Structures are given as C-alpha cells and as structure tokens.
Amino acid sequence: MNKSAQQKSAHVTTRRLLDMKHNGEKISMLTAYDYTMARILDRAGLDVLLVGDSASNVFAGHSTTLPITIEEMVYHAKAVVRGVHDESGRAMVVVDMPFMSYQISGDEALRNAGKIMKEHGCDALKLEGGKIIADTVKRITDVGIPVMGHLGLMPQSIYKYGSYKVRAKEGVEAEQLLEDAKIIEEAGAFAIVLEKIPSVLAAEVTRSLTIPTIGIGAGVACDGQVLVINDILGLNREFHPRFVRQYADLNTVIEHAAKQYVEDVRQSNFPSPDESY
C-alpha cells in the first residue's frame, strides 16, 4: 500500500451511520459548498458534509433556497467531492435536490437524481417532505441511490409556512410529522433531518425509527446534528438564530485582515522586497 492510500480513512457509508445510531455514537454534519472548505472539514473529522441548497442563501445571497438550480448544485457538489477525495476521503457527501427537481413527477425526480449522482459522484441525496414524496423516495432508493429525508421546517416550503418559526408544536402537526417520519423510513431513506421542531418530539421520532435522525434546532436527543458552516464560523453578523452555536468570529477576522491589506497597499508597505521577484 502506498503512502497516499495509507493516509486515507475509512469512508463513511449509510451502513456506518446506522451502526453509529445503534452504538450510541453521535453523527456530526456540516454544510460545505467549495473545495477548500470541504478539505478542511474532512480533515477535522466530520462524518457527513451536506452540499445544501442553503448555498442559495449564504453563497449567492438569495433570501430563500428556491432559486438555486440543479446545475448550480452540481457545480458546488463537484467541488466538495473533489475536496473530500483530495483530503482523507472519509466524509460522506450528501447533496440537496433543489426545489422543483423532484416534485413534478416520479420520472423527472428519478432522472434528476441520476443526473446529480452521475455528474459529481456524491454518496447520497436529500429530499424534503413526508408522505407526499414517499413514492418518489422509494423509486429513487429502488435504483440504488441513497436518500436522506427532511421533515419539520422545510425551507423549500417557506412560502407555504410564511415564516421560519418552529414547526409541529401542536398535536395534529406533531402526529403528522411522526407518521411522515415512519413513512419516509419505510420508503427506503437511510436517515432523516429534523429541523426546528420541539426537542421532545424529536426525541420521540428518534426512538421510533431504526434509521438515524440528524437535528438542526431539534434538541440533543437526535442521533446527530447539522448546522450551516457559515453560521458556526460567524460569517453573517445579521443571522443569530437560537439553535446556532457560534464557534468563531471570522467576519471580524476577515474584515480586519482585509483592512490591514488595504492599508499596506496604500502605504506601499506591500509587497516588501522579500515578497517581490
């Protein structure tokens, strides 16, 4: 075995995530949208990298996830997959299917799922929705494409909700979410993201399923957690939701570095003789 191969870690698979749930090991997941960040996060030991349609917000500046296209998702996914491959190769890469790429018909959903998988070599896809997309999930998983579900607050349905408030706080909606989770599991999903739901409900869903749950604003009882990388790094001063823990203030760090650069250029302090040819 060559040195490069020795440095590669065992790649995280759907089977590994299932084993982690059964062994009580928590699953760590963050979003990634580019090559450099993917390498850093894979090196840091993340189990899963999500190429989220949240790129529409944090990368392109849109107010919702709806505008991003399949072609744009493929662009980001290719970069992330290359990053993981060029680092340890350990992290699983999951890609969001964007709005209206799987809702029109089962045939179109299957065609788009195949397109996304073939064009960048990711490990799995993520779809939002409950029983209304169960047949689609089954069709996609039946051809061998792993699917991660997403329930609770579903950003692709933001205009239906009218806000980003906590979902399933009332009895009827909570019961429906629990039912949807079981239906999506039966349809073949290997895991389900639970977003902004009461922690008590998330715990109940987690206990009721044999597949892992990944929480975002859903409490500590979930089998794992996911956050947007920009949020934990403090890159957006205007966005401070309750469920995000900020681990760094890169907004300030980057701004300070840029200001220093501007000053050095204006004062002819950069480049120095050592930085010139």
Swiss-Prot record:
InterPro entries in UniProt: Pantoate_hydroxy_MeTrfase, Pyrv/PenolPyrv_kinase-like_dom, Pyrv_kinase-like_dom_sf
Annotated catalytic residues: 195 (proton acceptor)
Top-level division of the source organism's lineage: Bacteria
One biological process term in Gene Ontology: pantothenate biosynthetic process
Cofactor stoichiometry and binding remark: Binds 1 Mg(2+) ion per subunit.
Location of this chain's protein in the cell: Cytoplasm
Cofactor(s) annotated in UniProt: Mg(2+)
UniProt main location, coarse: cytoplasm
Keywords, alphabetical: Cytoplasm, Magnesium, Metal-binding, Pantothenate biosynthesis, Transferase
GO cellular component entries: cytoplasm
Gene Ontology molecular-function annotations: 3-methyl-2-oxobutanoate hydroxymethyltransferase activity; magnesium ion binding
Catalytic activity: 3-methyl-2-oxobutanoate + (6R)-5,10-methylene-5,6,7,8-tetrahydrofolate + H2O = 2-dehydropantoate + (6S)-5,6,7,8-tetrahydrofolate
Pfam families for the chain: Pantoate_transf
Enzyme Commission (EC) number: 2.1.2.11
Biological pathway: Cofactor biosynthesis; (R)-pantothenate biosynthesis; (R)-pantoate from 3-methyl-2-oxobutanoate: step 1/2
Binding, Mg(2+): 53, 96, 128
Binding-site residues for 3-methyl-2-oxobutanoate, renumbered to this chain: 53-54, 96, 126
Family: Belongs to the PanB family.
Record-linked HAMAP family: PanB (MF_00156)
Chain's role: Catalyzes the reversible reaction in which hydroxymethyl group from 5,10-methylenetetrahydrofolate is transferred onto alpha-ketoisovalerate to form ketopantoate.
Name of protein: 3-methyl-2-oxobutanoate hydroxymethyltransferase
